[in-house]
A protein has these predicted regions:
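Hydrophobic helix-coil surface modules that form long, contiguous segments used
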Residues: 42, 145-294, 323
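Zinc-dependent metallopeptidase catalytic helix centered on the HExxH motif
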Residues: 276-339
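Glycine/proline-rich low-complexity spacer/linker segments in large multi-domain proteins
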Residues: 16-19, 97, 106-156, 203-205
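N-terminal, polar/Ser/Thr-rich
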Residues: 1-41, 68, 125-129, 445-451
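Acidic/His/Gly-enriched intrinsically disordered linker/tail segments
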Residues: 268, 314, 318-380, 384, ...
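Beta-strand-rich interaction surfaces with strong enrichment in secreted/lumenal proteins
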Residues: 29-32, 46, 77-78, 90-95, ...
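Surface-exposed beta-strand/loop patches in extracellular or lumenal glycoproteins
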Residues: 45-65, 143-147, 155-162, 409
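A surface-exposed beta-strand-loop module
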Residues: 62-124, 181-184
């Protein structure tokens, strides 16, 4: 039976997530966490502007978190209902369209990941500490939010936890205040951020600088001390990656970049805004995960600064990050992007060709074929435009839509300005059909910029 608060889905890929009637501009989270009992208490302030007059509003929020009080614009809500992963609240008075909507939620509970078709995502208890890995819909496991990637906002996150632990969140560390046996860490992420990219990392970590002092982009490692030697070897070339990607993609979009390595093993690394999280198994002292180091760094441009408006366009994140792996290989003395692209195409040709990359469906949106064929789409475009125009396009793409939401149509439209020949056919066969196209020959006819 549908709840009386049911509304038509924002996104068919995640019909339970996202909310109507307002746009969030800021989150202020005050959190307290006890690692021994995995107990989280929080106060969340959500600042928004209404888009229409309506009697009630909803937020995404896990049922593992118990709500004790809700305020709307400083007054108690007439009532609130927390069910089926939604917190529905009714203000005492209707708010006009364009009016300020400030929601304060007090809550506590034992957070746990959200189960979905892609496994468990969100808050995860570690052997000692916790991590948050929310893609695509796990943010509601630890705070009430408008959990859809098109909803980007600034964040202030305060986290109080036991003093032996280091607590990391997105953005700049504003303060670190020890008190008795606990420490409060306060972080500010001024750049707009999608809810799934917000993160908390808590563990027995130490913070180290990565690279030389005075690097254009400050980089740090937050890692268990026992992994320092392996990390220094495995991530030694990250400053070179940063320099390369800044040259090819445009300026790094945030103030700094931090890599976390957990003391636990992780199946795959995880991107967050300004942060990437790796497992201890990715830090082997043999650079066995270097392509993933490049992949996660590239997500700071493609996924974090430029964030999809709808999940069907996931190739705009993963195809670009996968292609960045090939760009790094090419620049660092490994196989060229063309060699890797042709090898990837040969491998894809042996697999089922039953996915449309531009709309793969929710079940397959994290399928490796989306990643690889997305990267192949970019390589086909690069062969069509040649290097100079291709990388000029990428830099304009990241500059024009910096800290914004994006669609495939916007990228296709922008790319069209870089070629006298129509490009829609290229995008149509690579993104809009199931059969795997052939790559153009290396060194084929280049088209001229029309601008």
């Amino acid at each position: 039976m549908r709840s009386k608060f049911y509304e038509e889905p924002i996104d068919a890929y995640l019909p339970q997530n996202g909310n109507r009637g307002y746009r969030v501009s800021r989150y202020e989270l005050e959190l307290s966490y006890k690692p021994a009992s995995n107990r989280l208490a929080g106060r969340a302030v959500i600042i928004a502007v209404t888009t229409t007059v309506r009697p009630w509003f909803t937020l995404d929020m896990s049922q593992a978190l118990m709500v004790s009080k809700v305020l709307v614009n400083g007054s108690k809500a007439v009532k609130f209902v927390h069910q089926q992963g939604k917190l529905a609240l009714t203000p005492q008075q209707k708010i006009p369209a364009g009016g300020v909507l400030e929601i304060t939620v007090h809550y506590a509970g034992t957070p746990k990941p959200v189960r979905g078709p892609w496994g468990e995502v969100g808050w995860e208890e570690l052997t000692e500490g916790a991590l948050v890995a929310s893609q695509p819909n796990g943010a509601a496991s630890w705070f009430p939010c408008d959990d859809h990637p098109s909803s980007k906002a600034s964040y202030r996150i305060s986290i109080t936890t036991d003093s032996p632990f280091l607590a990391l969140a997105n953005g700049t560390l504003l303060s670190k205040q020890p008190k008795a046996s606990q420490t409060t860490w306060v972080y500010e992420m001024a750049e707009p951020m999608a809810s799934y990219l917000a993160t908390i990392q808590i563990g027995g970590y130490r913070k180290y600088r990565v690279g030389a002092a005075g690097e254009p982009v400050p980089m740090h490692a937050v890692i268990p001390p026992r992994l320092r030697a392996s990390f220094d070897h495995d991530f030694a070339r990250q400053p070179e990656m940063m320099a390369l990607f800044t040259e090819r993609f445009g300026p790094y979009p945030f103030d700094d970049y931090t890599v976390v390595v957990t003391d636990d093993e992780l199946d795959i690394p995880i991107e967050a805004q300004g942060i990437s999280i790796f497992g201890a198994n990715h830090c082997d002292g043999k650079r066995g995960a270097e392509r993933l180091v490049a992949h996660e760094l590239a997500h700071q441009w493609f996924g974090n600064s430029l964030t999809l408006k709808r999940w069907q366009d996931i190739w705009l994140h993963e195809g670009f990050a996968c292609y960045a792996e090939w760009i790094w290989s090419e620049a660092s003395g490994g196989p060229t992007a063309d060699q890797l692209a042709r090898a990837a195409r040969a491998n894809l040709a042996r697999q089922p060709q039953d996915i449309i990359i531009g709309d793969p469906g929710p079940k397959d949106m994290f399928d490796d074929r989306v990643y690889k064929r997305g990267a192949l789409t970019l390589h086909a475009l690069r062969l069509e435009l040649r290097d100079h125009l291709f990388f000029e396009l990428i830099k304009e793409w990241t500059a024009r839509y910096r800290h914004s939401s994006i669609t495939t149509e916007e990228f296709v439209d922008l790319a069209g300005h870089y070629s006298v020949a129509p490009l829609r056919g290229l995008f149509a066969i690579w993104l809009g059909t199931k059969p795997l196209p052939q790559l153009p020959p290396l060194g084929g006819q280049a088209h001229q910029n029309t601008r």
